[in-house]
Amino acid sequence: MIPFLNRAVNFSKRTALISNGKSFTYQDLIDQSDMVASNLLNSKKDLKEARVAFIVPPSFEYTAIQWGIWKAGGIAVPLCVLHPLPSLRYVLEDTQSETLIIHPDYWELLEPIFKELALDFIPLTNILKPFRKAILPDIDLSRRAMILYTSGTTSKPKGVVTTHANIE
C-alpha cells in the first residue's frame, strides 16, 4: 500500500473533505477508493501502470477515484472539466489511456469519441458500485502515479509524470 494512503487509516474518523455541503471522513474515502480499485482491477492483480483517465468535477468522488486508481496500480490522468473535446481527445491519445471514467455531466461532450478511441468508457455510477473487495497490489514509491498536463505555451500541452514518491 502507498504510505500516505496507509496513514489515512490513522485518521479514519476525521473529516477528510467537504463536498457539496457534506462532510466525508477518511474512512469514507478509504472505503470508496477500495471500491473503485476493486472495480478497476476486476479479476486482475495489478493495473501495472495502465493509464486511467477520469473527468469528474472537484468532489469527494474525484478524490476517491484518484486514490482508487493508485490503489489498483494505475496511473491517474485527470482531465480538466473546462477543456473542449479536441483538448480532451489530445490528452487521451497522448497518454495512451486505456480507461476513461466519466461523470454524467460530461457524457454528452465525450460521446463523439466513444467509437473513435479504443478505450474502456466507464460511467461514474458504475465505478462507484459495490464490488467484491479485491486484494490490492503493493505499490512501490518509484512507480508512476499521475500525468498532469501543462498549459502548453509553446505548442500542445505537455504531460508531466509524477511518481508516488513525489506525492509522498
What is the role of each PLM region?
Residues L47, D94-Q96, L117:
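Active-site charged/polar residues at nucleotide-handling catalytic sites that mediate phosphoryl
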Residues K22, A37-H83:
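Conserved AMP-binding/adenylate-forming
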Residues V81-P112, P130-F131:
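Conserved ATP-dependent adenylate/AMP-binding module captured primarily in the ANL superfamily
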